[in-house]
Amino acid sequence: MALVLAAAGAVTVVQFRDAAHEADPDGALRGLTDDITADLVRELVTILPIVLVIAAVAAYLLSRAALRPVDRIRAAAQTLTTTPHPDTDAPLPVPPTDDEIAWLATTLNTMLTRLQRALAHEQQFVADASHELRTPLALLTTELELRCAGPDPPTS
């Protein structure tokens, strides 16, 4: 037999031994703890799956929100690599936070700037080399055309 007393917000459970547990002096306490354990297991089996689902959904949403800046950087880099003539002056987006993702975006933008400068130097070198090669070839072509066109001019 159990008696539950509630007063001033405190709950007290008083368990009286019954005749079935007369031979066992701790029978009343053992029966009470078995009941409490069974209730606790039943509540955990009911509540734990719900808590796990809520935690999984919260973790998924939180990770998506945390990785959104990385996805923006990835999309901008993908645009740069798939566009035939990308706007290389448009940098990758840098999130307004002062964390590793912002540092990564800043570093990638610095690298892109250096690559643009290197490409510009290479294009200038090719243009200069092309000009330097065309000038002697043009002179040779002109001289050959003149020689093929007529007799040699008199030499003095």
Swiss-Prot record:
UniProt keyword terms in alphabetical order: Cell membrane, Kinase, Membrane, Phosphoprotein, Transferase, Transmembrane, Transmembrane helix, Two-component regulatory system
One family name in Pfam for this protein: HAMP
Location of the HAMP domain: 64-120
Ranges that cross the membrane: 43-63
Segments forming domain Histidine kinase: 128-156
Post-translational modification (record): Phosphorylated by HK1.
Gene Ontology molecular functions: phosphorelay sensor kinase activity; protein homodimerization activity; protein kinase activity
Localization, UniProt: Cell membrane
Catalysed conversion reaction: ATP + protein L-histidine = ADP + protein N-phospho-L-histidine
Main EC class the enzyme belongs to: transferase
Record-level GO cellular component terms: plasma membrane
PROSITE patterns: HAMP
InterPro entries named in the record: HAMP_dom (IPR003660), HisK_dim/P_sf (IPR036097), TCS_sensor_his_kinase (IPR050428)
EC number of this enzyme: 2.7.13.3
Chief site of localization: membrane
Sites of Phosphohistidine modification: H131
Extracellular topological domain residue ranges: 1-42
Biological processes annotated in GO: negative regulation of phosphorelay signal transduction system; phosphorelay signal transduction system
Membrane topology: Single-pass membrane protein
Cytoplasmic domain ranges by topology: 64-156
Role played: Member of the three-protein two-component system HK1/HK2/TcrA. HK2 transfers its phosphoryl group to TcrA.
Other facts noted in the record for this chain: HK1 and HK2 are merged into a single protein with a distinct N-terminal sequence in strain CDC 1551 / Oshkosh.
Quaternary data: Homodimer. Each monomer interacts with HK1 and the receiver domain of TcrA.
Protein name per its UniProtKB record: Sensor histidine kinase component HK2
Organism in which the protein naturally occurs: Mycobacterium tuberculosis (strain ATCC 25618 / H37Rv)
